């Protein structure tokens, strides 16, 4: 009876250890994704020209904006 209890306890410890390792691996992956520079491909960049830019702009060009995502830029 003691042997059965010891084997059951050891089996539970092994199962808990495996779960802890899996959770730690997921936490490490999440931490790596949150660090800046880890994956810049999904980052969007936006550029806006101020109203008092050095070059005079026509009325249609005022507030011209460029949005770049994954290497594709489009003007708004």
Swiss-Prot record:
Region Disordered, residue ranges: 25-45
Record PTM: This is a cyclic peptide.
Keyword Signal appears in the UniProt entry: yes
Keywords, alphabetical: Antibiotic, Antimicrobial, Defensin, Disulfide bond, Fungicide, Signal
Single GO cellular component term: extracellular space
One Pfam family, short name: Defensin_propep
Bias-annotated ranges (Low complexity): 30-44
Biological process according to GO: antibacterial humoral response; antimicrobial humoral immune response mediated by antimicrobial peptide; cellular response to lipopolysaccharide; defense response to fungus; defense response to Gram-negative bacterium; defense response to Gram-positive bacterium; disruption of plasma membrane integrity in another organism; innate immune response in mucosa
InterPro entries: Alpha-defensin (IPR016327), Alpha-defensin_N (IPR002366)
Signal sequence range: 1-22
Annotated propeptide span(s): 23-64, 74-76
Disulfide bonds: 68-73
Function of the protein: Has antimicrobial activities against bacteria and fungi.
PANTHER family recorded: ALPHA-DEFENSIN 1, DEMIDEFENSIN-3
Assembly behavior: Forms a cyclic homodimer; disulfide-linked.
Family note: Belongs to the alpha-defensin family. Theta subfamily.
Name of the molecule in the record: Demidefensin-3
